[in-house]
Design a protein with these regions (language model features):
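Short cysteine/histidine-rich zinc-coordinating motifs and their immediately flanking basic loops
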Residues: 6-13, 24-30, 54-60, 75-80, ...
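Short, flexible, mixed-charge glycine/proline-rich loop motifs
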Residues: 1-6, 29-38, 52-57, 95-105, ...
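Short, structured motif recognition centered on aromatic/hydrophobic residues
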Residues: 1, 11, 18-19, 69-71, ...
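Short cysteine-rich clusters marking metal-coordination/redox-active sites
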Residues: 12-15, 42-45, 63-66, 108-111, ...
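Short Cys/His-rich Zn2+-coordinating modules
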Residues: 20-29, 44-50, 85-96, 111-118
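Short, intrinsically disordered terminal segments enriched in charged and Pro/Gly residues
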Residues: 25-33, 75-99, 148-161
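Residues immediately within or flanking Cys/His clusters that coordinate Zn2+
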Residues: 9, 39, 60, 68, ...
Length: 161
């Protein structure tokens, strides 16, 4: 098992499994599984995505293996702004983006076109995958948490905290 860059979990490239220090519903990216399959496959693991609710409200298609998930672009923006605004914990120390992540392109689970791997254009050093055809965003486990905990102004707070 090797550590995943900038994250707190590990990945075994041999068997494509992951080891997480917390449960799926014990982070800023708390996902509650509904038990329903989607008919789409995870772009990382090629296992069937499932329906879940992110932080008790937004429905996402997620992977039980790698804990990545797909959400539409507009919903992603709303989630990031809302959760950053509500966060009151300690900021993460800034870390640079791993340039290798920009070459790690995924296939959109909906249309099967290649997604665009690019830096998230907001706080946090995160590379996200976007589909220009479907307007979907793929987030690997922990990426939304890094955006939430990134230093900088928080929406709804004129003092930046």
């Amino acid at each position: 098992m090797l550590p995943v860059y900038g994250q707190s979990h590990f990945h075994c490239q041999g068997c494509n499994t992951y080891d997480f220090p917390t449960g799926i519903n014990q982070t800023e990216e708390s996902i509650t599984p509904t038990g329903k399959k989607t008919g789409f496959d995870c772009p990382r693991c090629q296992v069937s995505l499932e329906v879940g609710t992110l932080n008790g409200g937004v429905q996402v298609c997620f992977c039980q293996n790698c804990r990545g998930y797909v959400v539409d672009n507009d919903t992603f923006g709303h989630i990031a702004i809302t959760l950053r605004g509500n966060y009151s914990g300690a900021d993460d120390k800034p870390t640079p983006i791993d340039p290798k992540q920009l070459d790690d392109t995924q296939t959109c689970p909906a249309c099967l076109y290649k997604m665009d791997a690019h830096p998230y254009y907001g706080p946090g050093s995160v590379v996200i995958d976007s589909c220009i055809h479907c307007r979907l965003v793929w987030l690997d486990h922990g990426e939304l948490g890094r955006i939430i905990r990134a230093p900088g102004p928080r929406p709804g707070n004129r003092y930046g905290r």
